Amino acid sequence: MQEKDCIFCKIVRGEVPAKKVYEDDKVLAFHDINPVAPVHILIIPKKHIMGIQTLEPEDECLVGHMFYVARKIAEDLGIAPDENLNKGYRLVFNVGKDAGQSVFHLHLHLIGGREMSWPPG
């Protein structure tokens, strides 16, 4: 199911352009339009899910697939840790407005390409 006015659903349908880096039958990954790091990719399910708070038990494999795709993209973009654990990346789900979720379609941020500090913002 897709939502008519959801910007990410519009990207899935090809109605809004995006700089895609990965696509399969379950997920789509593309560059964030407001990156916070040299590499900032959003991985979204093609199925409209509002967020973590609305996940159903049948979505468990889909969320696991999103993490697998994130790892593959990190490897492809050269930000995955090497054997000495140099480099690296951060995976983030923002859940709700107070956490910074601005698009209410489940999405996983893959952020890297620079040293990350903690705590974030």
From Swiss-Prot:
InterPro entries assigned to the protein according to its UniProt record, in alphabetical order: Histidine_triad_CS, Histidine_triad_HIT, HIT-like, HIT-like_sf
Gene3D superfamilies the record matches: HIT-like
Record SUPFAM superfamilies: HIT-like
Chain ranges of the HIT domain: 7-121
Single GO MF annotation: hydrolase activity
A GO CC term attached to the entry: cytoplasm
Pfam families reported for this sequence: HIT
Name listed for the protein in its UniProt record: Uncharacterized HIT-like protein aq_141
Entry-linked PROSITE patterns: HIT_1, HIT_2
Motif (Histidine triad motif): 105-109
Origin species: Aquifex aeolicus (strain VF5)
